[in-house]
Amino acid sequence: MHTDLDTDMDADTETVALCSSSSRQASPSGTPTPEADTTLLKQKPEKLLAELDRGGPPPAPGVPRRRGSMPVPYKHQLRRAQAVDELDWPPQASSSGSSDSLGSGEAALAQKDGVFKVMLLGESGVGKSTLAGTFGGLQGDNAHEMENSEDTYERRIMVDKEEVTLIVYDIWEQGDAGGWLQDHCLQTGDAFLIVFSVTDRRSFSKVPETLLRLRAGRPHHDLPVILVGNKSDLARSREVSLEEGRHLAGTLSCKHIETSAALHHNTRELFEGAVRQIRLRRGRGHAGGQRPEPSSPDGPAPPTRRESLTKKAKRFLANLVPRNAKFFKQRSRSCHDLSVL
């Protein structure tokens, strides 16, 4: 015997079943159920870790994949919903432009292939870019600007009947990136041209500081360094004499040459001389079987050499050249000859 209460309970049970069935039928096929959400939550950590191991999070639909040439810092991997600005951190490596050519991993291969890298150093306004552009146009059609770089030039030249590839980098001044880029230049160059203007004594006085920074960063290398007095055609505006430039070169154990990038005077001699200096110093290192700098039995040579250069630079800047004029004359006698050590 069924009572009204039993009838109501049966009706309620049937209503609940119908509602549940209707709810399942009304759900779109693409909408995840709670069970599917649980499965996705279980799978997300493993998938995310796998993507992080490969270098970054999975790209969102419609968003192009990031190039794999530069690793993304972990803090940017966590910003899943934000665009990553590649200038937010100092780049450590690059696969295009000048930074790729500067990679230290290619140094040995570059030497075998006869590729020499020459860095232009010096203060702003001394004519580095004009020198680089002049180098790029020495042979017309045979010169070309490197791809993806505005300040790097590469060309094949014949020096002493042997063809080499010479790459000239005018990237010493690059705005906010100048600090780390300058250090990278100092570590990877094969020869260094420290350019000053003969019409600007301040740029001339900065030469010892630049050279000391270079040799402090690479104390175990016999680096070819040429002091370049540019704008020699501006005779009426000259502030640095030829003799002063040679004296400084003799003091700092460098080569010296005066050029006029505007008139293409001595520009060919400069870059061919840089190639000769690289060959001569590498040949001397191979012949001696060790680093050519003098060594001391009481300790390593680099600190002593750096200290000596500092003292010499101070003596020069303190106007002590006249007292040692004979010594400097002997040291600077061949500093203008780029075909000898």
Curated annotation (Swiss-Prot):
Compositional bias per record (Acidic residues), positions renumbered to this chain: 1-13
Region feature Disordered, mapped onto this chain: 1-72, 84-106, 282-309
Bias-annotated ranges (Polar residues): 18-32
Ranges of biased composition (kind: Basic and acidic residues): 43-54
Predominant cellular place of this UniProt entry's protein: membrane
Sequence positions that bind GTP: G122, E123, S124, G125, V126, G127, K128, S129, N230, K231, S232, D233, A261, A262
Listed Low complexity bias regions: 94-105
One Pfam family here: Ras
GO molecular function: calcium channel regulator activity; GTP binding; GTPase activity
UniProt keyword annotation of Magnesium present: no
Location of Phosphoserine modifications: S27, S296
InterPro entries, A to Z: P-loop_NTPase, RGK_GTP-binding_reg, Sigma_54_int_dom_ATP-bd_1, Small_GTPase
Family stated for the protein in its record: Belongs to the small GTPase superfamily. RGK family.
Reported function: Binds GTP saturably and exhibits a low intrinsic rate of GTP hydrolysis.
The protein's name: GTP-binding protein REM 2
Species of the source: Rattus norvegicus (Rat)
Protein encoded by which gene: Rem2
